[in-house]
Design a protein with these regions (language model features):
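C-terminal motif of bacterial Sec signal peptides marking the signal peptidase cleavage site
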Residues: 16-19
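A residue-level marker of the well-folded mature domains of exported/periplasmic proteins
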Residues: 29-351
């Protein structure tokens, strides 16, 4: 039955591509949507397809991961396609449809796609599969050696945001919002929590992090609004998250709370790209250079060395960083923050 659904989906995609001439972007929330790389993409001999359960216009994770693929593809002359806002039940069928169409690389930005990727990778040994935030042990589970995990250091991601939260909180209470209970999300939460507490202690204050809450869905912006309001009521004044559109909903609630109070006193730290200026409450961003990680996968596909490895992203190799800070962060605090970031890079943070 799944094979039949996959074949039908492939037919629909072929007709869709023919109708639109292979270009254009449709992010309306249907099972498939076609993306574009650039003016040279149509002549490329290599093609990459991304699947995503959130929208690529969500202002967060989905958008950042899509842009990473497009940027890496543009640099190397690859053609791109994307299927976004897909349900969990459609992960496998959507992947298979791209494999049937002869795509060279399937890019799945999230640990939640692991089972579908491994199943498809077994059936299509000549297709490469890149799993962003995939487990360290996932490549070894691929019987054909055609799966690579791209793994930003989750603890360091949490540290980058947690240190800023520890410096900026006035209430001593900070908050973290998740979408799904993934190992990578828990790693970010724990890193955020320990860094906020440590930096707070260094600055002479006690900082606690509320228990993580999960929406169960990366697209549930309404849950972000609900969670943020409840956490603000519990005293949280700095937020971080790993929940895509849910984070966008949280920022909406934070902006509304600040507007009601007449001042910006509740803050949000964005990720995984620079979103400074998108919402008034955003004071900084933790940035992951996913484009460089995806680009390494494309290079490996081209030279025939792809698969069976974990590619790590860290502060030390430049894949992780903190971007520009808002003017809401005082100059002396910005200087202290840079000092803590330097400690993270040289390995002395929390030592």
């Amino acid at each position: 039955m799944k094979k039949l659904l996959a074949l039908l989906l492939t037919l629909v995609m072929c007709l869709s591509l023919a109708a639109c001439g292979g270009s254009g972007t449709d992010t309306s929330g249907t099972d498939t949507s076609s993306g574009e790389t650039g003016e040279d993409s149509g002549d490329s001999s290599y093609r990459v397809a991304m699947i995503c359960d959130s929208s690529i216009s969500d202002g967060g994770w989905g958008m950042s991961c899509y842009n990473a693929m497009v940027d890496a593809a543009a640099e190397r002359g690859w053609a791109t396609e994307v299927s976004d806002s897909i349900a969990q039940s459609a992960y496998y069928d959507t992947i298979i449809s791209y494999c049937d169409l002869g795509y060279d690389l399937i890019y799945a930005p999230g640990n939640q796609y692991t089972d579908a990727v491994l199943q498809a990778a077994e059936e299509f040994p000549d297709v490469a599969f890149a799993l962003l935030n995939g487990g360290e042990d996932t490549p070894a589970k691929a019987v054909n050696g055609n799966v690579t995990s791209l793994l930003p250091n989750a603890q360091q991601v949490g540290w980058i945001a947690g240190a800023l939260a520890g410096l900026m909180t006035k209430s001593g209470t900070v908050a973290f919002i998740g979408a799904m209970e993934l190992d990578t999300t828990l790693g970010k939460y724990n890193g955020f929590k320990e860094a906020a507490a440590y930096v707070g202690q260094q600055e002479g204050k006690t900082v606690s992090t509320l228990d993580v809450v999960y929406s169960g869905d990366f697209s549930a912006a309404d849950k972000g609004i609900e969670f943020a309001k409840a956490m603000i009521d519990q005293g949280a004044d700095v937020f971080f998250g790993d929940a895509s559109a849910v984070d966008s909903g949280a920022r909406q609630a934070i902006d509304e709370a600040n507007a009601a109070s007449g001042s910006v006193s509740i803050y949000d730290i964005a990720q995984p790209s620079d979103l400074l200026g998108q919402n008034e409450c955003i004071i900084g961003s933790q940035v992951t250079d996913n484009a460089s990680l995806v680009g390494l996968c494309m290079e490996a596909v081209e030279d025939g060395s792809f698969g069976g490895e974990v590619i790590y992203g860290t502060l030390q190799n430049g894949a992780l960083s903190a971007d520009a800070l808002s003017d809401l962060v005082p100059a002396d605090v910005q200087e202290k923050y840079q000092g803590y970031l330097d400690q993270m890079v040289d390995g002395s943070f929390m030592q």
